[in-house]
Amino acid sequence: ATYKVKFITPEGEQEVECDDDVYVLDAAEEAGIDLPYSCRAGSCSSCAGKVVSGFVDQSDESFLDDDQIAEGFVLTCAAYPTSDVTIETHKEEELV
């Protein structure tokens, strides 16, 4: 399946199409959207975002705790879309 992923960045909103087997960070990069990242392995917080609506599968990540996930935080480098989804990017500072 292919879903619409909308990124709300400091520069504005941008939307990409993302297959359900592609990480949302990779889909953003392919579309020329510059998002923060570091490890690309789901084990740090550089790429953290927050899901505003919709759902992702981020079972590959190993950094966020259950409370952070419940609040909507997402590691874009290790998240697959499971529906149309809207994600606020550049949220690493809010994870403290």
UniProtKB/Swiss-Prot annotation:
Location(s), subcellular: Plastid, Chloroplast
CC cofactor: [2Fe-2S] cluster
UniProt keywords, alphabetically: 2Fe-2S, Chloroplast, Electron transport, Iron, Iron-sulfur, Metal-binding, Plastid, Transport
Pfam families, A to Z: Fer2
CDD domains: fer2 (cd00207)
Record's keyword annotation contains Transferase: no
Positions bound to [2Fe-2S] cluster: 39, 44, 47, 77
Comment on bound cofactor: Binds 1 [2Fe-2S] cluster.
GO molecular function, one term: 2 iron, 2 sulfur cluster binding
Domain 2Fe-2S ferredoxin-type: 3-93
InterPro entries listed in its UniProt record: 2Fe-2S_ferredoxin-like_sf, 2Fe-2S_ferredoxin-type, 2Fe2S_fd_BS, Beta-grasp_dom_sf, Fd_pln
Single biological process term from Gene Ontology: electron transport chain
GO cellular component terms listed in the entry, alphabetical order: chloroplast
Reported function: Ferredoxins are iron-sulfur proteins that transfer electrons in a wide variety of metabolic reactions.
Family per record: Belongs to the 2Fe2S plant-type ferredoxin family.
NCBIfam families for the chain: fdx_plant
The protein's name: Ferredoxin
Organism this protein belongs to: Brassica napus (Rape)
